[in-house]
Amino acid sequence: IDVAKHPEYDIWIPELIFGHLRTSTNYKKNEKRIVGGKNGFGFKLVLIWSTYGMIETIDHVRGLKYVQEFNDNLNEICEPKITKCKGTKPYTRVIFKPDYKRFGIEGMTSDLFSMLKKRVYDIAAVTDHSVKKIKITFNDELVNVSNFSQYINMYIGSRGDCKRIHESGDERWEYAVALLSLIHI
């Protein structure tokens, strides 16, 4: 992610990406895509349903680290802290605290924790690791799923445990089908 001001909007690009609704470019419904974006909503919706959020990203080309906090369901967007950094590999990290009251709960439930953890594993399974080594973590623990096949194995076991049809239809889609008597997610 470029740590620079957007030439048209005069807003820092990370803030535009993560903190302002309808800022992506994937609005054409007839266009073939290899991503499943939600028209620029993504993490912004997480921030709207959170009491606190933070983004941290490294722009290794410009040698800048960008940190910005968001509070009160995205009602407060804090000024970013931008510092110089040299020789650091690029990454983006997001942190958030759900607004438990809005969800009608007092704190993190085991169901919510499991759902959030599953979504992180979903992301790890569909992230393209072929271009560069991308590390995905959940609560500072490395997620050891780097492809869709490993993701399937988490739920139904190895090919020896459970027969399946697993194909890559083209560069855009990968899918699997298995017959199970019982699946527990």
Language-model features: locations:
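Contiguous hydrophobic segments
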Residues: G42, I183-I185
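Phosphate-interacting basic helix/loop segments used at nucleotide- and nucleic-acid interfaces
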Residues: E31-G40, L112-R119, I123
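Short secondary-structure boundary/capping segments
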Residues: P7-D10, F70-N73, D111, S146-I156
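GHKL/Histidine-kinase-like ATPase module
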Residues: C78-E79, S114, K118-A125, H129-I183
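Generic amphipathic alpha-helical segments used as scaffolds and interaction surfaces in large
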Residues: Y100, G104-D111, N139-L142
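GHKL (Bergerat-fold) ATPase N-terminal catalytic module, capturing the glycine-rich phosphate-binding loop
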Residues: I1-E106
